[in-house]
């Protein structure tokens, strides 16, 4: 379970970085060269998704819960936005859903 969760967090980080770098280029006039590491990060994101031992739809559904948490950590650390009660409650609910799906992997 811990290995799966850590893999999901690494996957989410790759996806967020892969999307954030082009965002910097488009919104903040950063260097176009950021598209190169963005592409690499997104390719790594896709590869990491293939490492999970479950059907792709289950992986994507469970991954969504961890993605929400990772995105909010990004919001706090990178964007510097203070998290609200709602920002904490939403991921808690999402992680409960992720946990139900992952626990069920071995039972189907």
From Swiss-Prot:
<feature type="transmembrane region" description="Helical">
    <location>
        <begin position="6"/>
        <end position="26"/>
    </location>
</feature>
<feature type="topological domain" description="Cytoplasmic">
    <location>
        <begin position="82"/>
        <end position="84"/>
    </location>
</feature>
<feature type="transmembrane region" description="Helical">
    <location>
        <begin position="31"/>
        <end position="51"/>
    </location>
</feature>
<feature type="transmembrane region" description="Helical">
    <location>
        <begin position="85"/>
        <end position="105"/>
    </location>
</feature>
<comment type="similarity">
    <text>Belongs to the UPF0060 family.</text>
</comment>
<feature type="topological domain" description="Periplasmic">
    <location>
        <begin position="52"/>
        <end position="60"/>
    </location>
</feature>
<dbReference type="InterPro" id="IPR003844">
    <property type="entry name" value="UPF0060"/>
</dbReference>
<keyword id="KW-0472">Membrane</keyword>
<dbReference type="GO" id="GO:0005886">
    <property type="term" value="C:plasma membrane"/>
</dbReference>
<keyword id="KW-0997">Cell inner membrane</keyword>
<dbReference type="Pfam" id="PF02694">
    <property type="entry name" value="UPF0060"/>
</dbReference>
<feature type="topological domain" description="Cytoplasmic">
    <location>
        <begin position="27"/>
        <end position="30"/>
    </location>
</feature>
<protein>
    <recommendedName>
        <fullName>UPF0060 membrane protein YnfA</fullName>
    </recommendedName>
</protein>
<keyword id="KW-1133">Transmembrane helix</keyword>
<feature type="topological domain" description="Periplasmic">
    <location>
        <begin position="1"/>
        <end position="5"/>
    </location>
</feature>
<feature type="transmembrane region" description="Helical">
    <location>
        <begin position="61"/>
        <end position="81"/>
    </location>
</feature>
<keyword id="KW-1003">Cell membrane</keyword>
<keyword id="KW-0812">Transmembrane</keyword>
<feature type="topological domain" description="Periplasmic">
    <location>
        <begin position="106"/>
        <end position="108"/>
    </location>
</feature>
């Amino acid at each position: 379970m811990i290995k799966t969760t850590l893999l999901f967090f690494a996957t989410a980080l790759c996806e967020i970085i892969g999307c954030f770098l082009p965002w910097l280029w488009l919104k903040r006039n950063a260097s176009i060269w950021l598209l190169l590491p963005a592409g690499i990060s997104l390719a790594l994101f896709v590869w990491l998704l293939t490492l999970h031992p479950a059907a792709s739809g289950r992986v994507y559904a469970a991954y969504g819960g961890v993605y929400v948490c990772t995105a909010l950590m990004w919001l706090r650390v990178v964007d510097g936005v203070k998290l609200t009660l709602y920002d904490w409650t939403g991921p808690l609910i999402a992680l409960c859903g992720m946990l139900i799906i992952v626990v069920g992997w071995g039972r189907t």
